[in-house]
């Protein structure tokens, strides 16, 4: 982390990364980042425990990845507020609807996928802003 010059701000983006880490390791990383990079933002994707189980049964198995023993999962982004007093805000948006909502522009199949991802596996894009 010391190699990163964040003197003019920083945004960290991690897509599909934290599923491979244990929750306690993710918690330590987020806390360390909040201390090292005040005012920065961290954006990442998440899903709930059901979604993590589905990943374990499907694409990780198909990819031959067997050494992933514990997955980071998130039922509600508000859980993260308890992780560090250095978090200024924690917000989330639908993973499938993202920052530009296309729901009204897609067909029935995609609308069903969006609803599945939003309600059953709670796929989200999460943003943490660290305190200055």
Residue ranges of each PLM-predicted region?
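Alpha-helical subdomain
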Residues: 1-132
């Amino acid at each position: 982390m010391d190699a990163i010059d964040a003197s003019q701000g920083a945004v960290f983006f991690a897509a599909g990364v934290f599923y491979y880490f244990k929750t306690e390791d993710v918690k330590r990383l987020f806390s360390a980042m909040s201390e090292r990079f005040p005012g920065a933002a961290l954006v990442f994707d998440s899903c709930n425990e059901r979604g993590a189980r589905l990943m374990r049964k499907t694409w990780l198995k198909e990819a031959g990845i067997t050494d992933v023993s514990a997955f980071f999962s998130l039922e509600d982004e508000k859980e993260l507020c308890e992780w560090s007093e250095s978090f200024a805000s924690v917000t989330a948006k639908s993973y499938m609807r993202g920052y530009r909502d296309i729901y009204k522009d897609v067909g029935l199949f995609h609308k069903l996928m969006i609803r599945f991802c939003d309600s059953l596996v709670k796929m989200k894009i999460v943003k943490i802003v660290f305190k200055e």
